[in-house]
Amino acid sequence: MKKLSLFLIIISIISCKTVEVNQQRQQTTKTVVELGVIGKITKGIEINTFQTTTVPVYKQKIRVSADILAFDDNTFNTYAQAALQQNKKIKITYIDSVANKPGYANLQILDKVQVLDELNAPHNTGVNTYLQNATNNVLITGLSAYFDAIELSNISQAEEVYLINNKPKKYSLELVKSGKPFAIVDISKSVPFTYTTASFCWKKERGKISIANLTYKSETCARETYKNVAKLNKKINYYKY
């Protein structure tokens, strides 16, 4: 009986830290999380906390997928806790028995190659150097957030969505329709309540260290690439012996 109770407690704690969004388990957050930033996750008993450590410069816009999803009980409760903690005064009327439920946006970075190019570019040398010397940093690759009705409507009409760095250390969404931008959405005005992350895999070519790839969840780095930069400098050349 004690083992069963302990098991149920563990399952309850895990379920509080994640919630299913679009058939994907995502980390829950009560604090503000921004798409495209880099930071560290501090594990807690009830919830993990993400803290931003560095904000990369994206000179090129990054393609993003944007799905408008309807709240269910789990996602709405997660949102409500986040809105309270973030002191965001955005009111939503949610009734479980009503078929037409309010929606939110699920954003995911699509263009991983563009992100890698940007992180390895000269304008992000400081970010790159920091990441080489600081462990356990992750990139925010996706988030679920509530935007006001007008912005949600604009996002739903967009044929293409891009993450843009239109102000210093500030990201927005550029919405495109018929090949032309028609709206800019300020992400900071939303209420994020879940997020996804990716870790960095590093390589060394001709003496230069750079980010080779981004890995998700339990994925491992490809051959000759490592999550720990120190391993690149500890490789032994056995041909010397």
Which ranges hold each PLM region?
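An N-terminally focused, membrane-permeabilizing/fusogenic/translocator signature enriched
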Residues: K2-K3, S15-G103, C221-Y241
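Membrane pore-forming effector domains from diverse proteins
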Residues: T53, K91-A158, E174-Y239
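Bacterial N-terminal signal peptides
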Residues: S5-I13
